[in-house]
């Protein structure tokens, strides 16, 4: 079944480029940039990937991102991810990047963007993988900081298609970012947001009504609110669900408890994605395979999930 799932044409709509930084590349970039790491080798770092919640993961994620310093580093990171896409027949990807993770430690915005954008361009020309880049604001920082990031991004507006919202969800509701999202929309950007991963269904309502998002990233807690479920079904609002991430971060204790297939059968436009694959133990095919192994996903369900991902693209073919 793995090979069949791997060959299925699919899109990936929820992937953080910084979260695809594999330990081997992390060590190579640290050496290139002469950065001392707190881990002695790749295996020690892999063992550190045993987190219990979103915050523990984020602490490690930001520490790892510190090795990314030059445009070449960001190119190499993005290119390594695109090669994985090619291996897994991901024909279109809409990755997130978190400029604030880098600008806050002194890496200029254009250094980050130039490396990523040139890799995505080469990915289309050399690998045939189309893409649309999403700039994501960090929700644990202030809206004022997000506004500054949007200011930095506007001269490069052609390089990305949408803005998003990620990082620590609890205590940082979408309403905190209403004005910057209003402004981004007025500048012509589409909008998406992480909501309903650890946060309550109310955060999904806010993301829809206040941020006016086109797509919900995660959204698994919508299942707790029947009125919200009905709206998502009626309006066919896509959810970019990340099964391995959800179990690794204890949103669900075990994959057998995941609600993605129940949502699919209810008529929700759910999609399968890898989120931060270097940290969560798998890329898109591994996520599909886990649904087959632990939830008994059928080939018909896999086809529908893959088609949903192609239908839910912000960048239409």
UniProtKB/Swiss-Prot annotation:
Residues reported in the UniProt entry to bind Zn(2+): 14, 16, 194, 275
Organism superkingdom: Bacteria
EC class name: hydrolase
Obligatory cofactor(s): Zn(2+)
Active-site annotation: 197 (proton donor)
Catalyses which reaction(s): adenine + H2O + H(+) = hypoxanthine + NH4(+)
GO CC entries: cytosol
Keyword Zinc: yes
Site features described as Important for catalytic activity, chain residue numbers: 218
Task of the protein: Catalyzes the hydrolytic deamination of adenine to hypoxanthine. Plays an important role in the purine salvage pathway and in nitrogen catabolism.
PANTHER family: ADENINE DEAMINASE (PTHR43114:SF6)
Family note: Belongs to the metallo-dependent hydrolases superfamily. Adenosine and AMP deaminases family. Adenine deaminase type 2 subfamily.
Protein name in UniProt: Adenine deaminase
